[in-house]
Amino acid sequence: IRRQRQMCIRDRNKGYRMNKLPERIRIKDIARLADVSVGTVDRVIHGRSGVSEASKKRVEEILKQLDYQPNMYASALASNKKYTFICLLPEHLEGEYWTAVETGIHEAIATYSDFNTSVKINYYDPYDYHSFENASEAILALQPDGVMVAPTAPQYTKGFTDQLQALDIPYIYIDSNIKDVPPLAFFGQNSRQSGYFAARMMMLLARDEKEIVIFRKIHEGIVGSNQQENREIGFRQYMKEHHPSCTILELDLHAERNDEDNEMLDEFFRTYPTVKNGITFNSKAYIVGEYLQSRGKKDFNLIGYDLLERNVTCLKEGSISFLIAQQPELQGANGIKALCDHLIFKKEVTCINYMPIDLLTVETIDYYHSK
């Protein structure tokens, strides 16, 4: 820029002239060179309307010649604009997986409090697609500045995001990604690769066993999470490629009738007494882990997901062999950061942001800290 301080800048009305510019280029310097008002320069820099094409072109030419980089941080602080974000998450109990996501959301929004940001969290029933539709319609009516959503089934998510796009509202996916409906950014694991990896770990435990079981939580045929479905797809892909002769059994526990879990597990193990290996793709591996403890079954290998307190307890007590973690706090925090970077600081945002696939054992759990 210093070489350009004494450059010939063309003024449409006055031709070329030498300009002595200060070390720090100010908006009023650009306005003088472009022969426009300070307000016009400000509108061009921040992409606002109300500027003629001729004035916009002159300002942009000078900005380019000076390699001017606006101080978006200072501009945002000086602005009185308020930014409202809404997050749409599955309903959950305190202490479950989504509680950690909420923690990340609130911690992130607090760091941007100087920029008049606020966040509201709305919920939908993950086992009821109409609940998602109703919750999304309520968000659209409010027309927030940005949205973060944990997607449900693609066809229902697309109905929501199509309307967000029509309203020019940027949106973030967390937990699971829908490739046919690209967001501003996605934060979460590569679900299929995670399931593929989980199958490999499962078979390191199972060795030559010919039967394994997948435990699910289902309500009226709905698993309640795209990510769980994609993990299972990846899991089955690995098994088909490397252990095609291994039988994969299934036990679907009722999502809303937890009091029946132990009875259903008892019936399963009476029917399949030789099964010694299983996995659950949701965050409630503790349901099976606590059952195994209560029945004194110490010869069963169980893999689960997420560092819920009850899962970690089962891991330490031996009824869960491995836990796969995905840093939910960071997903929530990074989603808010991406919205702020895009809307407030006008930064480019990376679209696909995969979280690591972290494998935790009883020997490593006490030394693990999500980043």
Locations of regions flagged by a protein language model:
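Single conserved hydrophobic/aromatic residue that forms the stacking wall/gate
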Residues: 1-12
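N-terminal helix-turn-helix DNA-binding module of bacterial transcription factors
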Residues: 10-76
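Hinge/cleft segment of the Venus flytrap/periplasmic-binding protein
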Residues: 62, 66, 222-223, 239, ...
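Amphipathic helical "hinge" segments at domain boundaries
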Residues: 71-130, 134
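Hinge/beta->alpha junction and helix N-cap segments in small-molecule ligand-binding domains
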Residues: 90-99, 121-131, 188-194, 216-234, ...
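Hydrophobic alpha-helical
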Residues: 146-165, 249-310
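Flexible loop/hinge segments that line or gate small-molecule binding clefts
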Residues: 156-193, 309-316
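Hydrophobic alpha-helical segments within soluble ligand-binding/sensing domains
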Residues: 186-212, 261, 327-344
